[in-house]
UniProtKB/Swiss-Prot annotation:
This is tRNA uridine(34) hydroxylase. Catalyzes oxygen-dependent 5-hydroxyuridine (ho5U) modification at position 34 in tRNAs, the first step in 5-carboxymethoxyuridine (cmo5U) biosynthesis. May be part of an alternate pathway, which is able to bypass cmo5U biogenesis in a subset of tRNAs under aerobic conditions. It comes from the Bacteria. GO terms for biological process: tRNA modification. Gene3D superfamilies: 3.30.70.100, Rhodanese-like domain (3.40.250.10). One of its GO terms (molecular function) is oxidoreductase activity, acting on paired donors, with incorporation or reduction of molecular oxygen. The keyword Oxidoreductase applies. PROSITE patterns: RHODANESE_3. It catalyses: uridine(34) in tRNA + AH2 + O2 = 5-hydroxyuridine(34) in tRNA + A + H2O.
């Protein structure tokens, strides 16, 4: 019977990936379609992906699939062909290729079955997730940005918006996607006559959000096909002005793709212009925050003097201090003046 999960340590897998000589391509894709047996589908896809040496994070549910992966360059076309042949619903599926890629985005394959591929908190039995808004292509996006009757709604989390967004786009002040959905409806109630344009990193969140807005009585709703990634790629290919400002946050080891030269965020420690996210080097903290090179040297990669001091302690003393304390990654929320606790690199589906 084939092994359908990883049995090698995370450190060993990362070292193995870093030692690889073959380049890799970072790809993301999603598809809303009915999967009758997510567990069986998961096991079959795990074998397919493993055979092609694919790393990454994949979620499956009855509502579809959501994946961010790293594929050896020589296997990309084989992967594409086998994915398209796996299920008729996946034939011709758009694969978003990373805009900036060092091939080091993932080093282990994690594939999980979930209740939803995007945690939306929707329990309305009358909600039709397939009744989505209209797609916008790159040229149409730019035209909408110049339309005074159009409002651009960013359906990403605050730390994503902080480092990059479309010109004049509105931020929905929430920590998770499930919190954003009702807030988006509430914030836009006075603007039902406007054209609502929704976007996210790769399209999965804004597609569902567009359906939710239509479900709540908004009739003029659009969303950007392929999200920021596909927009930037097509705009560059077609010689169009790229109207996204700053960096596109991504949920892997890269933590960002440069879209424009502007740096619109600031170091969370000294306030200098900076849009580089990092995790606090203190194993008892791992706060996700923005840190400039000067502060990185000053605080030795930590988020505070306290964490800097603690990370210098002997390992046993660090473990003693962490005992009984809430650990795991935290996210610095500058707009709210507090921290949010999550597990691992922030999950775009939450």
């Amino acid at each position: 019977m084939p092994v359908l999960h990883n049995r090698i340590s995370n450190d060993a897998l990362k070292a193995k990936m870093l030692a690889e000589s073959e380049p890799r391509t970072t790809i993301s894709f999603y598809k809303y379609f009915h999967i009758a047996d997510p567990k069986a589908t998961r096991d079959a896809l795990y074998q397919l992906f493993t055979a092609l040496n694919v790393f990454g994070r994949v979620y499956l549910a009855h509502e579809g699939i959501n994946a961010q992966i790293s594929v050896p360059a020589s296997n990309v076309e084989t992967f594409r062909a086998q994915l398209y042949a796996f299920d008729p619903a996946l034939e011709g599926l758009r694969l978003n290729i990373a805009l900036e890629d060092d091939g080091k985005s993932f080093w282990v394959l994690r594939m999980k079955v979930r209740d939803r591929i995007v945690a939306d908190g929707i329990d309305d039995p009358h909600f039709d997730a397939s009744n989505v808004g209209e797609y916008l292509q790159a040229a149409e996006v730019n035209a909408m940005l110049d339309d005074p009757d159009a409002l651009f709604i960013d359906m990403r989390n605050h730390y994503e918006y902080e480092v990059g967004h479309f010109e004049n786009a509105l931020e929905i002040p929430a920590d998770t996607f499930r919190e954003q959905l009702p807030k988006a409806v509430e914030m836009m109630q006075a603007h039902k006559d406007k054209k609502i344009v929704m976007y996210c990193t790769g399209g999965i969140r804004c597609e569902k959000a567009s359906a939710w807005m239509k479900h709540n009585g908004f009739n003029k709703v659009w969303h950007i096909e392929g999200g920021i990634i596909e927009y930037a790629r097509k705009a560059r290919e077609q010689g169009l002005p790229v109207r996204f400002i700053g960096k596109n946050f991504v949920f892997d080891e890269r933590m960002g793709e440069r879209i424009s030269d502007e740096i619109i965020a600031h170091c969370h420690q000294c306030g200098a212009p900076c849009d580089s996210h990092t995790n606090c080097k203190n194993d008892g903290c791992h706060l996700l925050f923005i840190q400039c090179p000067v502060c990185a040297e000053k605080y030795k990669g930590c988020c505070s003097e306290i964490c800097c001091e603690e990370s210098a302690l002997p390992p046993e003393e660090q473990r003693r201090r962490r005992a009984g304390r809430e650990n795991g990654n935290k996210i610095f929320n500058k707009s709210r003046g507090r921290l949010n606790t999550t597990l691992g690199i922030p999950d775009p589906t939450e």
